[in-house]
Each structure stands twice: as C-alpha cells, then as structure tokens.
Amino acid sequence: MKFKKKFKWGLLIFFISWIIFAQSCMKFRITDGQAKAEFEQRGLHARFLTVKEEGISLHYVKTGSDSLPTLFFVHGSPGSWDAFKGYMMDSALLQHFRIISVDRPGFGYSDFGTAYHLTDQAVLINKVIQKEDNQKPVHLIGHSIGGPVIVQLAQDYPAEFASLTILAGSISPKDEPKEYWRYVFTYSPLKLLMPGAFKPSNDEIVYFKKDLYSLDTGYADLQMPITFIHGDADKFVTVKNVEYGKSKLQHNPHIKVIIIPGASHFIPWQYYSLIRGHLLTLSAMDSERN
C-alpha cells in the first residue's frame, strides 16, 4: 500500500512538473535583444515594433528602407518572425525591398499561447500592414500555414497586395489529413500537456481544417501574380495543394509554379537561393508597374 501511495504521489508530481515545464519551454522565439545583437553583428539596423488592436499586441520586425516596396513574411506553425531572419539580412534583397516579418497571433510575442481562426489572423495582421503603408507595392510570402493566412489577407483586402508567394502552403481543405488526435489535445485537459508553442499550433490547425472551407469560396477575387513553390517529397503538406490552387485560380493568367524534386517541407531554408532568386524577380515586376 505504501508503494502504491508513493507511486501515485510521484506520478502526480511528475505531471504537475511537466505541465509547468511545458508552459515555459519550446516557445520558438528569441528576444528582441538577442535578435538586435545578431543584426548589429551584420552591420544592419532592425526595428522591433508592436501594434495593439483590441487589447491584442502584434509584434513584428522590420529591416531596410521605408522608401522601398515591401516583402512581408508570414511564418508557419509553430514559429515566429525569425524563421525568415536570413532573408531580412540578405544584402541583395535589401537593395530592392523593405522586409517585414510578423509574429502571427498566438506565437512569438503576439499574444503567445492563444490560437486564432484564419479570418481573425488576417484582420490582425492587416493592422501591421496598414501601419507600415508607404504607398509602395507589398508582396506577401507565407510558409506552410502562413500560406492560407496570406490567401485570406489577399481575399479580404485584394487591392492592397502586389503578389503572393506560397511556400509549401496548406490551402486545400480536401487534402488536409484528418489527424483526429489533435481534437483530443484541443478539447480536453490533455491540452495542458502540450509544450510551449505546440499548444496554439495544435489548436489553430484544428481551427484551420474547417476555416479552409470558407477560404475555398474567395479565390475569384485574386487577380495578382501568385507563385506556388513546393517540394514533391513534402510529408507535412502534400504537393497536391498546388494542383488545388491552380484549379481555383484558372481565371488568373499570372500563376507560376515551381515544384522542387525531392524537397521536403522546409524549403525556405533548404532552398534559400532558389527562393531568394524568385523574390528578386518581384523587383522587376515593381519596376514594370512604375
């Protein structure tokens, strides 16, 4: 009996300790001070900024000249603005663009821990875009779940954006894996066991599986150039999403598709040169517009 009692207490202490540990780690973010030091080592000045909307703080980082067109990056799940730190330090890109990367709602330093639906994320992120409006073209780039976020932004505010680049984006509701286990960790006390950023990540993925069906009806409004870049060996987001996107955008003559043979889900980092090359072509697009 004593052993059983000690075992139960030990198990309880373990779970309490795990819950405390889980909420304090794996947040997938760095402090502004750490990031500032990294930029300064490269001789770059980064600005760390916050927009407040209805009691929610949205954190984002900006590099480059405010007189230039904007590359606006939206990260996947989990993640934070620094997923695109390398691009924000790139001297070739900075010759042509101001670069902004945002902590999506629920991640980084943007109301960390609370998941938001797709439409709510678009409304909040657009507040950053409005604040940073410099009357120059804005190009949206989204990776993974950042893909449907930028599609939602473009559907809601079609006149605001010059182009979309969808990197391994999960936009097809019919190609989403069922993953019923996620619902257990969203709608039961087991959610307390999810560490750090994995909790809002799991919650928003559950939301997005339904939200994508609403997104499905708004593609007719997208007339701007749209580029899909995807690996055909992506195990997280199937390359079938590209075919879905093409089928929804048959009215748009400005669709470009780059399928990378053998590439996984992590193309922003593993195929940096290819993606940077694509982004540099957007500068030529801006010149033609002027």
State where each predicted segment sits.
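Conserved HGGG/HGGXW glycine-rich cap/lid loop of the alpha/beta-hydrolase fold
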Residues: 63-108
